[in-house]
């Protein structure tokens, strides 16, 4: 619990004070938040992604942990499951079974007691041995988990939640608002980043988000995690920044700086010095693409 709590009760209280300051629907309506003191609530999150492995194979990796944990990834991310993507059954059957167990596990942590039933809703019996003996007992003394985040790249979020609106759609592409990929109304296009963009006025409430997912023929078990909320479903910062806009923003900035031969500061001076090399690399890339 020392690792999951961020090292101290004060770290937990500080995190929850920040969360309370947002005054959002998730905080106000989460049953675990309303029934447990902040120094006993561990904010939990989980992350998923298809990780590249040997010889081009991919592995679906899901891990979980505390949002307030401090330390390196090896110590703070706890593996939940890993399965080769090629071994997944067609459709959603394999993932459904995995996410049923994840949902069941997180809900047990949020209740703070060893579960009395398995992920299928069947009660444990004497044949289940240790699980039956521990059923209903405190799981972590007086601590409870509190789901606070689902994180991943867009592909995994789409597949894990069965999002009908995604990057593969020609119309609506976002699970949080009604923004579109192509539209005669420029204001509703996803490329409109203005603060007054019309699509910002279409942000879904959590109930609207849940209604969309529940209306589908197949529903992801993850939306039945206690306290599940659209505002706590987020894109992994690695994919948004490092593998996303930085790949465009950084080269663009370097191009502008070297083109104008900016010299202010030692850093810019170094950029000017590598300008010939950058031009050569750009020429090589164009030749390869041709």
What name fits each language-model region?
Residues 50-55:
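Short acidic, Gly/Ser-rich segments with clustered Asp/Glu that frequently serve as metal-coordination loops
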Residues 61-120:
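Compact, glycine/acidic-enriched structural inserts
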Residues 56-58, 186-187:
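Short, solvent-exposed loop/turn and secondary-structure capping segments
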Residues 41-43, 59-64:
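Short glycine-rich loop/turn motifs
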Residues 1-30, 35, 39, 43-46, ...:
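Charged (Asp/Glu and Lys/Arg) segments that form or flank catalytic channels of large polymer-
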